[in-house]
Amino acid sequence: MVKWSELPPEILHLISLKIDNPFDLIHFRSVCSFWRSSSLLKFRHMTSLRCPLPLDPGGCGDDCHILSSRVYLLKCPNRDRPQYWMFKLQAKENGEVVLHSLFLRRNSSAYGCLYPSLSIDLLNCQIFELAQEHVACYSEWFELFECISKCEERIGFMGLNREKNEYMILGKLSFNGLAMYRSVDNRWTELEITPDSFFEGIVPFKGKFYAIDRTGKTTVVDPTLEVNTFQRSRPCDKTRKRWLLMTGDKLILVEMCTKSRYDFHIPNIREKKIWFEISELNEERNDWDQVEDMDGRVLFLEHYCTFSCLATEIPGFRANSIIFMDLWGGSNSYELESILVYEFNEKGVRSLRDKLEYIELFPFPPGWVISNG
């Protein structure tokens, strides 16, 4: 059997070209000196994908591009006490990579800790990719104020062929309803759906896009632009907010509920009488089936990104809990008070400050990560 270190250099180089994660490339290059000399020197972050919108009356929209981010979990088990950190890396329009604080909408420049001033010992730490985020950024002309506004919108993103840079995007953006952008066509196509719907979640799942609006209607869009819609068989009139996310091979609907709209708008977080309901997509019946358990997972409902991980991955985390952002503006959006926790067993909302075992996961960045070297 041929030794790994004796693989032809051209094959090693081709393999390194197909690695789409910067930390995986570092691990690949660390196998031996021959692999390092035969592979990419460093990960090549691509400039933002462009998807120009039709020009609006103010001549805006042709600058539309996609900002891509990845969420990582860093584990450092070789210390006196295992430590963990969850963070986001965002590739800017010019390909520059910026460190972002998860849930707190600020980047490394705002914090005063410029990337790449962090040094991570990958020999003694493990890094896992938890999720990817894609956001459409574009300019829009506001006739009322006669000014240009910079907009960010959640989208669904589906990569088709990485080598040929082929992809599809589904979003509302400046359109009346949903529209799809296909890179092979290099244009947007508006879908024939009810206009002026506000979509609370858009995700790709098994080769299709799923979007849900604030009425609870689910829209399914095929790459061929075929559109189907369905309402759940048991609608809930208590739902105030919805999220979609994938957990393993399942598509999950998360609904925040209150008995009345007044309860939803109570400013004091501790007095909020809210609860969450979880449902799984039933593809055969085009319906959402409510479930009582989240398979031991913790759900993260971020501004543009939703994802999950097993509670056993992080000691101290409790299964069947949800971490989400303050939707009511009752706290400082740049502080940990704006990150909230809901646990199904306790039936109540708390600030992250009240859950000491969770706090260490989100500082920006924790002191043990920063290197002065």
From Swiss-Prot:
Keywords: Kelch repeat, Repeat. Kelch repeats lie at residues 165-207, 262-308. Coiled coil: none annotated. The keyword Repeat applies. It holds the Pfam family Beta-prop_KIB1-4. The keyword Repeat applies. Residues 2-50 form the F-box domain. PANTHER family: DUF295 DOMAIN-CONTAINING PROTEIN, F-BOX PROTEIN SKIP23. This is Putative F-box/kelch-repeat protein At5g24040. The lineage of its organism: Eukaryota, Viridiplantae, Streptophyta, Embryophyta, Tracheophyta.
